[in-house]
């Protein structure tokens, strides 16, 4: 008995121990002790084996279900398991005499960390798998068929039939198939999402392109407006410059006209004064001079027009035109000489006034000789002309 008490002190609370022989004396006490000792050793070995097997099964199930999806009822079941430990220990502590009755009814208390399990019925274990499988998420309206578990009449009084848990039902395979089907659905959903994302990306790209096009169009419109504005400004500047040039030309023309008028006003009074102050002897000298200049200018203009019109004429006409031109040049040279002599005589007359009548006679003689000089020069010119011809 001392040895049994020591074992009881080391063992956990939920382990079954044989009853004390002192409390139940009888004629068959030795046989009963040996039977109880053998029964306790067998129960401890079977409990350890069952616990190890259940741990392996639970770990495999957890791995498979974690791979497929996380079920919300998993946490609730683990909580129920955690809550079952103190409850079972409390029952074993409060009612030690009911251990034998529990064994008779099929209950079994393990010495490991697992909670107590009913020996005769495994219905608490089977619905756990059903709950973990749950409803198919792809088809939520599909009716769920719960398979009936084994009948409760399998529980025997000997307490050795349902010690080991039942093998995994085909529901686990259905859950695996469900995971594969979910993977297929996820692949379809992934393709749909990828297509939607591609459409969104294309839409965003089109939107960005449209925004860039609008910006470029706005920039082009602004540039066109600036070009138009600059063109208008340049046109205004050109008009102003043209008006200024016209005004400058008009001013120049007016200035030239005014200068010509002033020159005419200055020349005409001098000619009149000279005509009034000069003697009658000088009139035939000055009058033919001005007439000759006018005639020469007129002939020169006609010569220019005739030369332009007769550029493509015959060589005989050109030779006649050259002869006439030489004659006119000689006449101009003789006229210039006469003008020089007249100017010299006029200067001498105003510088040295005549004091004696003899001087006047000499001056008249000189004038007569000068008047005869142009006649002689004209005669000589007339004589030389046929020689040239």
Curated annotation (Swiss-Prot):
Bias (Polar residues) ranges: 35-44, 90-102, 307-317
Source organism of this protein record: Pongo abelii
Keyword Oxidoreductase in record: no
Alphabetical UniProt keywords: Coiled coil
Similarity remark: Belongs to the ZC2HC1 family.
Keyword match Transport: no
Coiled coil regions, renumbered to chain: 211-266
Residues covered by region (Disordered): 16-44, 84-115, 301-320, 343-389
Name assigned to this protein: Zinc finger C2HC domain-containing protein 1C homolog
Biased composition (Low complexity): 368-382
């Amino acid at each position: 008995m001392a040895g049994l008490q020591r074992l009881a002190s080391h063992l956990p609370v939920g382990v079954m121990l044989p009853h004390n022989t002192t409390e139940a004396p009888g004629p068959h006490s030795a046989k009963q002790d040996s039977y109880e000792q053998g029964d306790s050793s067998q129960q401890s070995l079977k409990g350890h084996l069952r616990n190890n097997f259940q741990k392996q099964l639970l770990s495999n199930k957890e791995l498979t279900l974690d791979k497929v999806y996380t079920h919300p009822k998993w946490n609730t079941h683990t909580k129920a398991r955690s809550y079952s430990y103190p409850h079972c220990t409390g029952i074993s502590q409060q009612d030690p005499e009911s251990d034998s009755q529990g064994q008779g009814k099929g209950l079994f208390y393990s010495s490991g960390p697992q909670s107590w399990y009913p020996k005769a019925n495994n219905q608490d274990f089977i619905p756990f798998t059903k709950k973990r499988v749950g409803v198919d998420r792809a088809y939520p309206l599909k009716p769920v068929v719960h398979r009936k578990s084994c009948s409760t009449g399998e529980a025997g009084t000997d307490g050795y039939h349902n010690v080991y848990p039942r093998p995994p039902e085909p529901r686990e395979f259905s859950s695996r198939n469900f995971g594969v089907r979910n993977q297929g659905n996820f692949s379809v959903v992934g393709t749909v999402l990828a297509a939607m994302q591609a459409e969104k990306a294309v839409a965003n790209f089109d939107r960005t392109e449209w925004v860039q096009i609008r910006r470029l169009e706005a920039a082009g419109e602004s540039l066109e407006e600036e070009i138009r504005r600059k063109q208008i400004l340049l046109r205004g500047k050109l008009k102003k410059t043209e008006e200024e040039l016209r005004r400058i030309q008009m001013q120049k023309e007016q200035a030239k006209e005014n200068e010509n008028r002033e020159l005419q006003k200055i020349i005409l009074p001098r000619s009149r004064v000279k005509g009034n102050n000069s003697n009658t002897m000088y009139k035939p000298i000055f009058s033919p001079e001005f007439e000759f200049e006018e005639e020469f200018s007129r002939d020169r203009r006609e010569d220019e027009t005739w030369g332009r019109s007769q550029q493509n004429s015959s060589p005989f006409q050109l030779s006649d035109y050259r002869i006439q031109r030489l004659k006119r040049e000689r006449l101009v040279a003789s006229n210039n000489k006469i003008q020089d002599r007249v100017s010299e005589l006029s200067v001498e007359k105003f510088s040295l006034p005549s004091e004696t009548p003899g001087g006047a006679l000499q001056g008249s003689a000189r004038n007569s000789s000068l008047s005869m000089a142009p006649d002689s020069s004209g005669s000589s010119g007339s004589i030389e002309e046929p020689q040239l011809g």
